[in-house]
């Protein structure tokens, strides 16, 4: 019997406080290869792009909480075996990975990202930097309440450590999450597969944040924002070669049972610029 796979389109922009995330999800939906029987479910997200306010130290906390809650409900209704998620920012992985952790007792998580996303409101204000911590039962005190079964640190391997921020590495150590330091700007698929086998993991959920890649090698990342000034202190620039990331994911997908795959933080700056032209051109209404 064929496994049931759904595609979630989650254009959440509030958790990263940047409207371009919204359009990234929409574009990924359009360009993804079609597969008969893979139902697409779009989570409604406001597209007014109004300025956001902080609540309890978190940007738009109520809005992002509701969007995760809506995603949980949509997944529960479908009860899939596998989930593809198009974001949006990194928070979009919370609901599908939490569901898969309930479904599979032997789930492992590979987190491919320039940042480990294990922050909390005392470290950073945007929810997308807390998602892995939320899944581990830490992070934003409000959001882990939507995770019915938290991940154990032993289930998670963070791929793409590239120096990063000291406080993030300290949190990884505090939470007990294993991580693989990048060598020569390439990901180590063999190392990841060895970790999977050594830990008795049978199913994999893989999270890809596009910012793990060198912005000169892959354009649609945070660091190619045309309006970006000095790089923020808490932003680690990706250095991974795109070909290495593609090879890593292909190998994992062929040699493991990949039950969850998220593409997050695909940031189509040129599409946003084109949209601005259309908004300013009278014929569009």
Where are these regions (language model features)?
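Surface-exposed, flexible loop/turn segments at secondary-structure boundaries
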Residues: 117, 164, 269
């Amino acid at each position: 019997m064929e496994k049931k796979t759904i595609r979630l389109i989650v254009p959440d922009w509030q958790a990263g406080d940047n409207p371009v995330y919204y359009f990234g999800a929409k574009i990924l939906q359009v360009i993804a290869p079609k597969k008969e029987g893979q139902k697409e479910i779009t989570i409604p997200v406001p597209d007014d792009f109004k300025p956001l306010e902080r609540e309890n130290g978190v940007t738009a906390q109520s809005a992002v909480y509701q969007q995760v809650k809506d995603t949980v409900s949509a997944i529960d209704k479908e009860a899939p075996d596998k989930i593809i998620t198009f974001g949006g920012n990194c928070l979009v992985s919370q609901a599908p990975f939490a569901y898969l952790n309930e479904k599979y007792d032997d789930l492992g998580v590979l987190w491919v990202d320039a940042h480990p996303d294990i922050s909390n409101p005392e470290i950073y204000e945007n929810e997308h930097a807390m998602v892995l911590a939320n899944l581990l039962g830490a992070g934003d005190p409000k959001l882990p309440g939507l995770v019915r079964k938290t991940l154990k640190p032993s289930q998670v391997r963070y791929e793409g450590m590239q120096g990063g921020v000291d406080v993030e590495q300290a949190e990884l150590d505090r939470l007990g999450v294993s991580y693989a330091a990048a060598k020569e700007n390439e990901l180590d698929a063999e190392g990841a597969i060895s970790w999977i086998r050594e830990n008795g993991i049978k199913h994999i959920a893989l999270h890809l944040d596009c910012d793990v890649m060198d912005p000169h090698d892959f354009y649609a990342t945070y660091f190619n924002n045309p309006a970006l000034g000095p790089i923020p202190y808490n932003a680690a620039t990706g250095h991974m070669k795109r070909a290495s990331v593609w090879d890593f994911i292909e190998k994992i997908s062929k040699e493991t049972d990949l039950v969850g795959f998220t593409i997050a933080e695909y940031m189509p700056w040129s599409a946003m610029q084109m949209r601005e032209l259309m908004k300013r051109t009278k014929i569009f209404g």
